[in-house]
A protein has these predicted regions:
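Glycine-rich, proline-tolerant flexible connector loops at the mouths of alpha/beta enzymes
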Residues: 1-4
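Mid-sequence acidic-hydrophobic segments that form the walls
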Residues: 12-15, 36, 44, 60, ...
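A structural motif corresponding to the C-terminal end of an alpha-helix
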Residues: 12-19, 122-124
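Catalytic beta/alpha-barrel core
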Residues: 16-26, 30, 38-53, 66-78, ...
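Conserved structured catalytic cores and adjacent interaction surfaces
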Residues: 33
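Catalytic alpha/beta core domains of metabolic enzymes, predominantly
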Residues: 54-124
Length: 124
């Protein structure tokens, strides 16, 4: 939908008073969202996994006070996720949330019953 969708979110905000949020993956997305008055931004798993994309987004957010949700990368790489959060924090943003959506599993020669699930059930 792109930029046209931002107008719809703006209308939702006006009619309901609700906060509106959308995903950003580039600096252009950030600028368009800020221009449209989006209240909360989130960064998806693929952008989180790309330090170059994260730095571009962080640079676009310098001097802005907006909540940012950062989803975990698809693969279980905690340092990559922390690095993404640090880049946003180093740009001056303080209202951050780490959103865990689960990790993909590498194919195994010993498949588990729940291998089709993105977030594996915890084993007690």
């Amino acid at each position: 939908v792109g930029v046209d969708g931002l107008a719809w979110l703006k209308e939702v905000k006006k009619e309901t008073g609700m906060y509106v949020s959308t995903e950003v993956a580039t600096s252009k997305h950030v600028y368009e969202c800020l221009k449209a008055g989006i209240d909360i931004l989130w960064i998806g798993a693929r952008a989180t996994a790309n330090p170059f994309a994260m730095q571009e987004i962080a640079d676009a957010l310098k001097g802005v006070d907006i909540p940012v949700f950062v989803k975990n990368p698809v693969n279980p790489d905690l340092e990559l996720w922390i690095g993404a959060l640090e880049r946003i924090n180093n740009a001056g943003l303080k209202r951050l949330a780490a959103i865990h959506r689960g990790f993909s599993r590498v194919a195994s020669s010993h498949p588990e019953p729940a291998d089709h699930l993105r977030s594996q059930p915890h084993r007690w």
